[in-house]
């Protein structure tokens, strides 16, 4: 089992953020999932920025799963054993991650259908106690509640540890596909800071104690 990450807090007058050290343990496995059906994508840019913020604060190995890449092999499968090997490998990465960063554009008032189809194949108990950072993009602020009304209930079914602070971005936060909003950048940084202690806690707990 991994040891709990202990923050080393800098003195107040330095203005430096806490640094997380993990000793001799392996890097945390961070898997980001973009539910966008387009490339390039604001959603992919957002989950990438969140992953980068985590990487600035902890030792990680990251992987990005894009539905634009695996969608054709995913869409036609009705059972998990019908999935092509490359999609099965992505599912195993999701199930074995220490932290999931999941994001979807708002599509017909919810996440994309292929995003849901992907998680329909995830084992019912394979995300128990797993930290999940929720993110979404939409055309305006009126769609921001997708995180609370759509994404959070989905991962509550899996008994995942959804982080209280989600990250929503609208079109005005981007110039093309580049994040330009200082407010959004600050929220990404705050989400990363708050995620790390929970990732360390979850990684130190035997999953057998969490399944019930």
Protein language model regions, located:
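Mobile beta-alpha loop/short-helix "lid" or hinge segments that flank ligand
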Residues: 63-73, 157-175
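Short, conserved loop/helix-junction motifs that constitute active-site signature segments
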Residues: 124-128
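Glycine-rich phosphate/pyrophosphate-binding loop and the adjoining helix
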Residues: 162-212
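Conserved strand-to-helix beginnings and helix N-cap segments that scaffold or border functional pockets
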Residues: 43-44, 112-116, 144-148, 178-181
């Amino acid at each position: 089992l991994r040891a709990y990450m202990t923050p080393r807090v800098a003195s107040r007058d330095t203005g430096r953020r806490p640094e997380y050290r993990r000793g001799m343990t392996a890097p945390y496995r961070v898997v980001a999932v973009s539910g966008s059906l387009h490339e390039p994508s604001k959603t992919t840019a957002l989950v990438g920025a969140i992953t980068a913020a985590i990487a600035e604060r902890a030792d990680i190995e990251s992987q990005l799963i894009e539905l634009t890449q695996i969608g054709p092999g995913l869409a036609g499968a009705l059972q998990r054993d019908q999935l092509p090997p490359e999609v099965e490998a992505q599912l195993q990465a999701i199930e074995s991650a220490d932290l999931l960063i999941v994001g979807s554009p708002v599509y017909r008032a919810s996440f994309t259908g292929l995003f849901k189809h992907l998680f329909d194949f995830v084992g019912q108990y394979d995300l128990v106690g797993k930290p999940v950072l929720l993110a979404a993009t939409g055309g305006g602020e009126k769609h921001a509640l997708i995180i609370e009304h759509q994404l959070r209930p989905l991962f509550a079914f899996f008994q995942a540890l959804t982080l209280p602070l989600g990250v929503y971005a609208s079109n005005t936060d981007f110039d093309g596909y580049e994040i330009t909003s200082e407010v959004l950048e600050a929220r990404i940084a705050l989400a990363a800071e708050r995620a790390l202690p929970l990732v360390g806690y979850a990684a130190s707990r035997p999953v057998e104690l969490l399944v019930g």
